[in-house]
Every structure is written in structure tokens, then in C-alpha cells.
């Protein structure tokens, strides 16, 4: 991180006023590199895949996020240290102290696990603490004197989803089709302490591909059918196994990956990362456990 700062890639935002965790400025080289990565991403999704790009506001009205489940469920489990009064992400503290599966634990179970663990800020034993949910969205009011509540978008997907009727007409009422968006998203992270890994404002590049529920065979699947990717499925995680390197065709045939569309875009994502210079030996795709998946997800990989 220090090298990146010295060379003009990134700097702490508002540094002359002390800065704030989770917000960064891209310096001259960082802004240039970021644009080049976005250009490569567009070369895959817009030029090669043929998806059109849209641009939506970063502020959305409350009904959008009520419908998407973000108002009710877009939260992390938080705890406050009784000694230094620092707010901490409870599952991260538990995981750092050897608690397996901390992300899937209930608030009550986390409270019990944290009892003998040290605070990651001051080092004191946490003791009896209450774990509670903290919603990660930034909220605001739209218009002067208005009672219309809004939020800074936590991801770019919602704009694409709310534009679906218009997009469907644009694509002449035919599935499948895709739409992409590159833009800022915002998450009020509890303790953004991992450099650029967990920011409060960040750029997302997102593609949403709409397919018929009964038509999940990708028309160009052969392009990536033989593409091999290390996959860490649910069963391997539960058995403490290692990622298994296999082709996308094999992953679909074995039922590890839900369908050809999911497999195609796992491979395409890997292809993009390798294209921008990421070492392929450092990549693996991990399947979300059933307890981690969003309510709408049949399959999900990171």
C-alpha cells in the first residue's frame, strides 16, 4: 500500500483533514489503470458479448430497496468493544480467532463465541457483549423538506432490474438478453481495514443476463466448455477439501455448477482477470454455502 501511495496510484481521501477509513482517491496512475481495467471489461461484455450499457442514478428511492430486500436484510453483525468503544464486525473478529463458519452464525451464537476473544482494536477481552445487525446502506432524504427517503445504491444491479420492462422492449421482447453498468456503489462498512478490499465507496462493473427459466443452455457454451477453473464447491468446503480444477462442461455435467449460463460466466470472469494480468495460479471460485446465498440465488460463486 505504501508503494502504491508513493507512486501515485492511490491516496487516502481528504488526507489533509485526517482522512477516513474506507474512502480513497485514485492518483494519476491509479485513475489511468482503473480506466484500462474498465476498458478491458467492456471489451468482453459490450463488444464481444454484445450487451448494451446503461447508466442509472446512484441515489434510489426507498421502495426499490424494500422490494430487493436490502432495507430488511442488507446488514452485517456488529459488536461494540466495552473497553475502547470501537465498533467491530462480529464475524470477522470470531473468524480471526479461529471460529469456523463465523459468517453463518446467529447473533446469539456469535455473542457466546466472542466472550473470551480479544478486541481487534485494543486487545482487551470482549466479555459479555451484544451482537446486533447494522444495515450497510447510506440513507438520505430526496428534496428539501421532503419525507421521501432514499439510499445510495449498495450495488449497481437495482437500476438494471427496475429498467427491465424498458430493456425488454428495447430487445424486442426476446430472451435471452443482457445489460451492463459500470459505476459507483456505496456500503457503510463497519470496519474497513483491508486497504482497498473493503471500501465504503467503490466502482462496480456488473452484467445482468436475463434468460428463460427453462432455457439455460448457453448458445455459445462451446467457447468455454473446455476452460478449466479451480472450483471449491459446498461439499468440499464442508469436508475441508481443496478446490478441484475442472472444465466448465464437467462442472455442469456433475451438477457442481447449476447450468451452462453460470458456468459460462464463471469462465468469462476468470478470462477477464487473467487478461488484465492476474496470476491464474492465485485464482479459485468458491461456491456460496446455502446459508450464505441471497434469497433469490439458486447458485452463486465468488
Model-derived regions: residue spans:
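TRNA-recognition modules of translation machinery and tRNA-sensing kinases, especially anticodon-binding
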Residues: 1-302
Amino acid at each position: 500500500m505504501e508503494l502504491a501511495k508513493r507512486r501515485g496510484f492511490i491516496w487516502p481521501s481528504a488526507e489533509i483533514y485526517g482522512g477516513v477509513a474506507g474512502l480513497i482517491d485514485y492518483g494519476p496512475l491509479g485513475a489511468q489503470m482503473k480506466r484500462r481495467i474498465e476498458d478491458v471489461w467492456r471489451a468482453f461484455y459490450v463488444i464481444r458479448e454484445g450487451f448494451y450499457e446503461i447508466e442509472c442514478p446512484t441515489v434510489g428511492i426507498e421502495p426499490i430497496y424494500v422490494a430487493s430486500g436490502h432495507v430488511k436484510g442488507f446488514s452485517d453483525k456488529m459488536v461494540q468493544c466495552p473497553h475502547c468503544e470501537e465498533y467491530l464486525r462480529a464475524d470477522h473478529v470470531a473468524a480471526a480467532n479461529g471460529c469456523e463458519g463465523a459468517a453463518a452464525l446467529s447473533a446469539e451464537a456469535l455473542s457466546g463465541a466472542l466472550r473470551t476473544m480479544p478486541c481487534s482494536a485494543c486487545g482487551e477481552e470482549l466479555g459479555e457483549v451484544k451482537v446486533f445487525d447494522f444495515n450497510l446502506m447510506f440513507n438520505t432524504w430526496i428534496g428539501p423538506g421532503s419525507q421521501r427517503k432514499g439510499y445510495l445504491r449498495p450495488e449497481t444491479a437495482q437500476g438494471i432490474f427496475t429498467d427491465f420492462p424498458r430493456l425488454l422492449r428495447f430487445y424486442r421482447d426476446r430472451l435471452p438478453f443482457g445489460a451492463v453498468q459500470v459505476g459507483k456503489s456505496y456500503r457503510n462498512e463497519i470496519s474497513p481495514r483491508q486497504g482497498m478490499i473493503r471500501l465504503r465507496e467503490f466502482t462496480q462493473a456488473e452484467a445482468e443476463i436475463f434468460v428463460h427459466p427453462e432455457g439455460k443452455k448457453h448458445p455459445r457454451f462451446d467457447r468455454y466448455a473446455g476452460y478449466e477453473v479451480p472450483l471449491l464447491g459446498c461439499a468440499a468446503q464442508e469436508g475441508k477439501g481443496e478446490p478441484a480444477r475442472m472444465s466448465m462442461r464437467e462442472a455442469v455435467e456433475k451438477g457442481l455448477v447449476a447450468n451452462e449460463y453460470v458456468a459460462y460466466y464463471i469462465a468469462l470472469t476468470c478470462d477477464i482477470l487473467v487478461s488484465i494480468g492476474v496470476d491464474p495460479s492465485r485464482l479459485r471460485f468458491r461456491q456460496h454455502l446455502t446459508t450464505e446465498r441471497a434469497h433469490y440465488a439458486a447458485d452463486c460463486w465468488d
